[in-house]
Each structure stands twice: as structure tokens, then as C-alpha cells.
Amino acid sequence: MKTIEVDEDLYRYIASQTLHIGESASDILRRLLNVDGELATAAPAAEPKGIVVSKDAAFDTKIDGVKAMRSLLISDEFAGLKNAIDRFMLILSTLHRIDSASFSEATMFKGRKRVYFADNEQTLLASGQTTKPKAIPNTPFWVITNNNTSRKQQMVEQVMVRMGFPSDIIEKVTHSI
């Protein structure tokens, strides 16, 4: 049996394809790829042992996300930022780095009259010429910035809630903006 590393999103996809409890990762991949065990190796292992998927599989990601956000809050880089907009942008960039797929889903919310996040500047300008769109560093996303600190805090709170962060870290992060 060989061990391979896979991205979190690929792992979740493979795990979601489990048909019965105890099904190994090798069995799932063989089924998904339509590969017989005979073609895989010349001398197949007697009993393939792979990952066992549990309902808590995604829990580790949240712990890593919480650690990353706590590290951000105590970092010299974050402490050195003097204005709310810079802290806001760094928080959004960090959330994207933690889990880009969840971030993408979490940023789909809209206000009554405004779109807050988009993948291009024009979409944000279309919801108001005074939105002051800015690119979120190291992401393909743009965000409106012409709003008060309270609105920025609400935006971050919404994203973090949708990404599944616990309320205590959400509160710490939003109050740090």
C-alpha cells in the first residue's frame, strides 16, 4: 500500500463518493476510475487499507483555520496595520488562503442594493459608482471598500459564519478590524 497526499477538496470529493461504511480509498478510486484491481498492480495487496471517512472529517480543517486566524491576530504584520481597510483586506486574504472553496461560496451574499464581493471590478461598480472596489491580495476576488468599519465587520462576520468558524474566533477577528 502506498500513501499519497491529496488536496483537501479532492479528499472531500473522494470521501463523499463512499457507498458503504469501511469502504477504502482504493476501492472508491477504482470504482470512480473504472479500474479493475488486476490492472493496478502485478501483486495486489491482500486487504487494501485506506482512509476511513467519518462525519468529523472536515473538523481538522476548522481547527487549522482557527489557528491560522489566531496567528494572524497576534502577528507583527497585523499589529503594524494602522487603518481598518488594511486589516480588513489582510483578514479576507487570509480567509481565502485557509479554504478558497469555502471562501468562494461564503462571498456569494449580497445586500439589498449592493454586491459586496465579485471576481471583477466591473461587477462591483455596476452596483454603485462609489463602491471603491479593491482587489483582495493573493485572491481572484474584489471587494467594495466604501463602507464604514461596522459594515466591514459585518461582511467578515458573514463570511466566517458561512465558512464554519466558531463564534468566539469570529468575534475576535471582527473586533480587530
From Swiss-Prot:
Which GO terms of the molecular function aspect are on file?
A: DNA binding
Q: Where in the cell is it found?
A: Cytoplasm
Offer one Pfam family short name for this entry.
SeqA_N
Biological processes, Gene Ontology terms: negative regulation of DNA-templated DNA replication initiation; regulation of DNA-templated transcription
Keyword terms? Cytoplasm, DNA replication inhibitor, DNA-binding
Q: Which GO cellular component terms are attached? A: cytoplasm
- Provide the assembly information: Homodimer. Polymerizes to form helical filaments.
The UniProt similarity line reads: Belongs to the SeqA family.
Q: What does this protein do?
A: Negative regulator of replication initiation, which contributes to regulation of DNA replication and ensures that replication initiation occurs exactly once per chromosome per cell cycle. Binds to pairs of hemimethylated GATC sequences in the oriC region, thus preventing assembly of replication proteins and re-initiation at newly replicated origins. Repression is relieved when the region becomes fully methylated.
**What name appears for this protein in its UniProt entry?**
Negative modulator of initiation of replication
In its UniProt entry, the species of origin is given as: Vibrio cholerae serotype O1 (strain ATCC 39315 / El Tor Inaba N16961)
Originating gene: seqA
